[in-house]
């Protein structure tokens, strides 16, 4: 599974699938990849996105009005995989859509589509045994969120359950671009380094090239989500072009090969 980071910092981008529609999402994803995204998180829209801030909430509402479903997201993943063989593809979802499809069926279809990993934002590692068995059976990488408030023993458990990379949440609260990174992020990465050799990606709040470069001084990758979704929201009619331009500005600061 190509969930490797070939430079430092690597760039993980998040998009809400179906905003403004699936066809445009495809163009956005391919534009981001062409501009230098290393991993793409394909966000499944959900009616109650409690972990997300207003930008992604609005995107989910727009996508749901288009009728976007988990099945459509997996079809999109298969299409993108045909065009981008070496880019990591991660499905980013709440648990409910996966349960509605069925965990086993979801994992089978996702693997067939060329998905590499899955992040279920509201599934605690302590309750993930059935999910993990299915993920491992279908050679998918389970990715879990690690928060600054997590005690060391829980970080260890999260790291042991994760494959591909560990997602370090830079701060508590919901998603959303911020002008300044939280000070907890670097400390959390140091704590994770003590319990895992997996790459660590930092997300929640990264919105510009300066923050992206800052994360690269202590983490393996940076996740940019709300800033991407906001770029889409502000550039109706030229979404793919605008995202490509934004990603290119970020990746221009990332030229150091990962070792």
Question: What does each of the following model-derived ranges do?
Answer:
Residues 36, 110-116, 134-143, 160-166, ...:
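Glycine-enriched alpha-helix->loop->beta-strand junction motifs that scaffold or abut catalytic
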